[in-house]
Amino acid sequence: MSKSIGIDLGTTYSCVGHFSNNRVEIIANDQGNRTTPSYVAFTDTERLIGDAAKNQVAMNPHNTIFDAKRLIGRRFNDPEVQSDMKHWPFKVIEKDGKPLIQVEFKGETKTFTPEEISSMVLLKMRESAEAFLGGKVTDAVVTVPAYFNDSQRQATKDAGLIAGLNVLRIINEPTAAAIAYGLDRSNQHETNVLIFDLGGGTFDVSLLTIEEGIFEVKATAGDTHLGGEDFDSRLVNHFAQEFKRKNKKDITGNARAVRRLRTACERAKRTLSSSAQASIEIDSLYEGIDFYTSITRARFEELCADLFRNTMEPVEKVLRDSKIDKSSVNEIVLVGGSTRIPRIQKLVSDFFNGKEPCKSINPDEAVAYGAAVQAAILVGDTSEKTQDLLLLDVAPLSLGIETAGGVMTPLIKRNTTIPTKKSEVFSTYADNQPGVLIQVFEGERARTKDCNLLGKFELSGIPPAPRGVPQIEVTFDVDANGILNVSALEKGTGKTQKITITNDKGRLSKEEIDRMVSEAEKYKAEDEAETSRIQAKNHLESYAYSLRNSLDDPNLKDKVDASDKEAIDKAVKETIEWLDHNTTAAKDEYEDKQKELEGVANPIMAKIYQAGGAPGGAPGGMPGGAPGGAPGGADNGPEVEEVD
């Protein structure tokens, strides 16, 4: 059975699962947590990913990157990117219209694309899975918000490539959650299920029908820029104003203070899901001033009222698009950590006339769970639970081309089941027109200027003819990942031209991806080297201390000559002092220093053990690194066998 995994690559947290023996195992990371912060930090000495990165964010706000998902596949001048940049302590710069993240790493200024940062998080998830499954893992299904557009999907796929994954498929988060909900419910009747997925940074609503293992998405809607982070930001602004009112000081220019406040706000927000009030206590927040305050659930709900209300629009849109009345929705499934907010639960319940949402699936893990099932199916798992499962997803946005006068002419309407293929015949609008420019857009507006340009290509060499005579067949083909291929055929000459909409403006080239893959491997090797360097340092330190402790042991004290004890004491003291002054030495230096110390200690320790030694040896065994017994034995004492 192949070791395939499903990864929920979240804005704020990520999660990974594996399906085998008819069940999904959500895999904990090296800290024992089942979700991992989507954070990457760069320091003077190393790169940290996940919990380790988030834990040091207040000390290193400018070089700790989060929210890469809010940048991926977007343009630098996107208004949402511009508004986010006001909240981020790290620096985002522009290159060729794309946003790049700039950090100080090991004393140098480095820039990374959002794809590279996301790939580091994916790599961390992959490593957790490899540790758990015991072996190499490459096959993965990665999830994206249902409302992600073409370039965001493509960029997520690239992030997987950079992390060394074979991305079997990109699937939509609410659809993955629906699998988690429906896998164990084998009712034969058609069930209409509404998935309400509100996470850290994105929001999706999908309506599916589930019947005999067939999961068919009827419609999807959402906002790729709404989630828990936005609620945190409202709290941060609220408390920053309160601090200013009380202390006449503005903390918003101080990245460290704002970060500490944001962490406290996130904690308070979580507390308010179960309590009516939460207190915030931050010592020495700014210029030595302590900040103690509290907030009630009602005040929090008021601060975020408009954001909470906005979550209802996509619900209405999905019901309209799928032509299903809200009374026909059989189950409401809440996914994403932000759905724990009581106000959100009440809004959803009230909208559906008091119907209670399903509480039986874990909102943090459902998406990774479904992705793991889909990954198993794609690598050929045939267990009884998965053999009849079929997933039919939809294109979230209409896809079309620009026709005369800047009109958006859709070929594939939104909520069309994918994979799908559609062709239409167009013609020229001027006499003897030698070529046509085919511009591909996505969006719902009537004019292309209000839609998103995905890419364009030229079909040239059309023989001279009056307008309207040449026949140009344009074909749109959307694959199972929701990624579009477009081709055009001039029927008279048989000339064809095609492009995969790899969003020429936003997409990484093959060369860039190859470069990033090799850099990712280089960073991984550096991380491993840093780990082994620290191990060598710890080894030396614990050896020095265990030597010192051995000499203080009452059983050994009497058997050591004063001069020998002094020699070891001196060597240990020198080693510990050297360690204090050389915290960033190379691995070899630590190993050489350990050999030096062993050179002093081993002959003395051997002498003690030959003279009869302590009963049962030194407590805790020989100090690490000392050979077990006299080197080669000696003539006057008993022969000592070396033991491991």
UniProtKB/Swiss-Prot annotation:
One of its GO terms (biological process) is chaperone cofactor-dependent protein refolding. Keywords: Acetylation, ATP-binding, Cytoplasm, Nucleotide-binding, Stress response. Gene3D superfamilies: 1.20.1270.10, 3.30.30.30, 3.30.420.40, Actin, Chain A, domain 4 (3.90.640.10), Substrate Binding Domain Of DNAk, Chain A, domain 1 (2.60.34.10). Its main location: cytoplasm. One of its GO terms (molecular function) is ATP binding. The modification N-acetylserine is found at S2. Residues 610-644 are annotated as: Disordered. Transmembrane segments: none annotated. The keyword Transcription regulation does not apply. GO terms for cellular component: cytoplasm; cytosol; nucleolar peripheral inclusion body; nucleus; plasma membrane; protein aggregate center. It is found in: Cytoplasm. Residues 613-635 have a biased composition (Gly residues). CDD domains: ASKHA_NBD_HSP70_HSPA1 (cd10233). Belongs to the heat shock protein 70 family. PANTHER family: HEAT SHOCK PROTEIN 70KDA. This is Probable heat shock protein ssa1. It comes from Schizosaccharomyces pombe (strain 972 / ATCC 24843). The lineage of its organism: Eukaryota, Fungi, Dikarya, Ascomycota, Taphrinomycotina. The gene is ssa1.
